[in-house]
Amino acid sequence: MSVPAALTTVDDRVAGVLHDGGGEPSGHSPRPFLHPVSTPGGRSVSDYRPEDHPWHWGLGIAVSTIDVVGQAHPANLWGGPTYRDGAGYVKLPNNGSQEVRVEEGRDDGRVQQLDWRTADGTVFLAETRSWHAESVRAGGVEWLATTVRSRWANTSGGPLAFGSPTTSGRPDAGYGGFFLRLAPSFAGACIVAASTGPAPSDVPAPPGGAGTRLSEADAMGSTRSWLGLRSPDASVLMVPAADNPGGSSPWFVRSTGTPMLCAAPFFHRKLHLGVGGVLHWTWSLLTADGPVQDDAFAAAADAV
């Protein structure tokens, strides 16, 4: 387990603190995470080990359901129990890990070399992950942007399939991907998303027309180029790259009860990766102080 390291911009703002996850319980699927994730003013927008889901830690990459040849159960690199159709959530001996083999600091951020392992220690995927932070001014707002670039290489000797509880039979539970467990202050936050058409009739239209305010039900599982949440204290915006595998990302988002935001590429269907195959991903998370207006969300999404 390495010492946590601050992820900073060139102008010395701290976007968050990077942990390798090495000291976390095995049943929580140890993996790297950024926490606290900070706004330019130093307010934390992330949560760590909340009572309802103690395997939720800040910002990171987490996948709940991975089919690996030779394993009795799908590998769980999300943490906690696994959803099985007809049985619900079941505690299985399948909690794997993302083990950081090498981590180094660079002028533009930090780079990690990781092994994805099943519960029995078998390595099935090699990942190179970079973390980069920068200050962004967009829409008249100061933002802190954290960008993660990730290369996944299948080293298992067989095909892999990445899924979610929804691909396993549970509706509206397609979580897994680039995940942020939000701070409790985001309970009841307003959801703002890229416009893809008319807003639902029961949701007020945004003043600038640059985005759409969505109910949680309408946002859940929808496919949009970006999605954000606005609370009285802070705002967050998540932007997946347009050329990520599978195209525009579906979203898993909650602002009631358990606030969280996840670009969830495996929400509706499994993503398959053949023997020796490689996937490239890029995601950005932007934070700002206070309740950002809709047009500023859109401007920030265009800036990364």
Where are these regions (language model features)?
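Beta-strand-rich N-terminal accessory domains
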Residues: 1-66, 159, 163, 286-292, ...
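Intrinsic-disorder/low-complexity, polar/charged segments enriched in Ser/Thr/Lys/Arg/Asp/Glu/Gln
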Residues: 107-111, 143-147, 276-282
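Acidic (Asp/Glu-rich), glycine- and aromatic
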Residues: 18-37, 139-192
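Extracellular/lumen-exposed scaffold segments
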Residues: 26-78, 194-197, 204, 210-221, ...
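Active-site/ligand-binding surface loops and adjacent short beta/alpha elements
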Residues: 158-246
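Extended, loop-rich substrate-binding clefts of extracytoplasmic carbohydrate-active enzymes
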Residues: 60-142
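Beta-strand-rich recognition/accessory modules
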Residues: 236-304
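Residue-level recognition of well-ordered beta-strand positions that form the cores
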Residues: 113-115, 130, 149-153, 179-181, ...
